[in-house]
Amino acid sequence: MSYMEIRNLKKVYNPYGVHPKVALNGLDFEVEKGDFICIMGASGSGKTTLVNILSTIDEATHGQILLNQKDLLLLSEKEKANLRKEEIGFIFQNYNLIESLTIKNNILFSLRLNNVDKKTQLEKLMPLAKMLNIDEIIDKYPSQCSGGQQQRAAIARALINEPKIIFADEPTGNLDSLNARELMEYFVKINEEKHTTIIMVTHDSFVASYSKKVYYMKDGHLDLFIDRNTKSQDDYYKEIVKVTTQMHL
């Protein structure tokens, strides 16, 4: 049984207007528990729209999204909020940090909402902050930090709850190559050891080579699929580069 099933998923912006825009055009695919999926495609192909809908941030026009056999499109706003709090981690292009809170308090925000004790908060915070190289800036405010530091803080905030599924939209976009590699290695670690399911959008073929599967989107539908299977990361990377080049991405 699949962890997540997407059936005939459609998204149309301005559906009753003069110029409706079809962002997703009848997608069908399945996500297994412990999958690490990368979604690639040209700008405007529907990648971010898909991730936003799967993570309940946006709503579909038509279709089904079954998570553990529960249709996300039929959930109430309260049920969606509880799902996001308990199971889902978000890493998006916009940091969405709270300017009036320190980096530390931004990261710990969800734990405090769940009344996690202070000792446990710190036990979760410090290893994550060190891994992301932000342990020395946790007492600063977002405005005092660089874009890369803010991105890493947003990543820590998403991971600290140990979510069952992570949605990441260009998570390495503001990171240098070293921090990008370390983040991807951490994704692989939690994917393999904790079976955390990851669905990630990226334009970077090297970042994509850390995943298990790559889907290519074009004009709102899934156009091509690559499965790593037993390939080495290097061979997988070369295949991704080849397909990406052929698609002129």
What are these regions (language model features)?
Residues I160-K164:
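A short, proline-enriched helix->beta-strand linker immediately N-terminal to the Walker B motif
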Residues Y3, V12-G26:
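A short, flexible loop at the N-terminus of ABC-type nucleotide-binding domains that lies
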Residues G63-D71:
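Conserved ABC transporter NBD signature motif
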Residues Y141-C145, Q149-Q151:
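Conserved ABC ATPase signature
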